[in-house]
């Protein structure tokens, strides 16, 4: 008989799937957003930062951005290596097949390059999850790992449950098996994303790990309670809620930014913005000379830029300066 991971599909889970499916439709519209490529880059950096921070990597998001941009960064060499490895693994994400065990091993080989001896190979020794000195989870024996992982991938291929549920169940079962010597947390989170992007490609760019990091204690509670119940239902609910919250947060952020980005800026307004960039203290009289239009028209254009949330006045009218909030 084939393996069936224990979990229940509750009314709460059905409701969350419905909400996520609707929200995914909304987020797909961001493909046409002028900020689309920038948003992808931002989210990839957030994903890598958060997934590694959960594993106690102390590098800041600014340091990680610098590493990704090829700049030199002062820091723990192992932590810097973790960032470089994670970037390589996530860059491979779109080519990974969620049903292929060999792809999981390929991703682990990259993720743990120069960090462990058995990168890309299942562990050959016992491992446990510790809270201080206390064992909170003792993983199955090493000689069982290849069979347990084969069963899990077989279930993933053959199950007809919704991909959102499958991704959560796989994530939980993967963490329970703890198939690798190290890197199990970041690989479990990566593989959930791989499963989800095979359902809807937009998931390749959603920083779900960021909200997991923000709710790290709840993440571990959901894993532990599912261990206690021998049933992953609690973990499924936690992860689905996290996925929904991630999408909602992105939509909310983009709704605030997009109207400003989509505002039509005239040629004269562009000249005004360039002048403000050069000198935030520039006066309307000076702008009149720079742009070549009457001071009255400068005033009208400045008001329009303020109304559209593109510039704001900082300080008093007489001695203050101009600040550009959002550019075209």
Task: Explain the meaning of each model-derived region.
Residues 1-328:
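FIC/Doc superfamily catalytic core
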């Amino acid at each position: 008989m084939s393996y069936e991971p224990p979990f229940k599909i509750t009314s709460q889970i059905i409701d969350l799937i419905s909400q996520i499916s609707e929200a995914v439709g909304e987020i797909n519209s961001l493909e046409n957003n002028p900020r689309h490529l920038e948003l992808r880059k931002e989210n990839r950096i957030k994903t890598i930062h958060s997934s590694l921070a959960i594993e106690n990597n102390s590098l800041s998001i600014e340091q990680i951005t610098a590493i990704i941009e090829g700049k030199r960064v002062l820091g723990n060499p192992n932590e810097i290596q973790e960032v470089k490895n994670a970037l390589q693994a996530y860059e491979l994400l779109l080519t990974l097949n969620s049903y292929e065990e060999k792809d999981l091993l390929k991703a682990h080989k990259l993720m743990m390059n120069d960090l462990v001896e058995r990168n890309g190979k299942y562990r050959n020794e016992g491992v446990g999850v510790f809270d201080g000195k206390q064992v909170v989870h003792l993983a199955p024996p090493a000689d069982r790992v290849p069979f347990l992982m084969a069963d899990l991938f077989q279930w993933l291929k053959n199950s007809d449950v919704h991909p959102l549920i499958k991704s959560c169940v796989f994530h939980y079962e993967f963490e329970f098996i703890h198939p690798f010597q190290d890197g199990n947390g970041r690989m479990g989170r990566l593989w959930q994303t791989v499963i989800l992007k095979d359902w809807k490609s937009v998931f390749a760019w959603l920083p779900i790990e960021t909200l997991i990091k923000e709710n790290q204690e709840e993440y571990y509670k959901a894993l532990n309670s599912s261990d206690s119940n021998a049933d992953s239902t609690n973990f499924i609910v936690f992860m689905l809620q996290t996925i929904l919250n991630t999408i909602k947060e992105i939509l909310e952020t983009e709704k605030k930014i997009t109207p400003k980005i989509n505002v039509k800026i005239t040629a004269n307004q562009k000249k005004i913005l360039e002048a403000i960039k050069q000198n935030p203290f520039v006066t309307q009289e000076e702008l009149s000379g720079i742009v070549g239009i009457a001071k009255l028209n400068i005033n009208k254009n400045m008001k329009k830029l303020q109304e559209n949330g593109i510039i704001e006045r900082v300080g008093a009218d007489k001695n203050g300066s101009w600040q550009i909030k959002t550019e075209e």
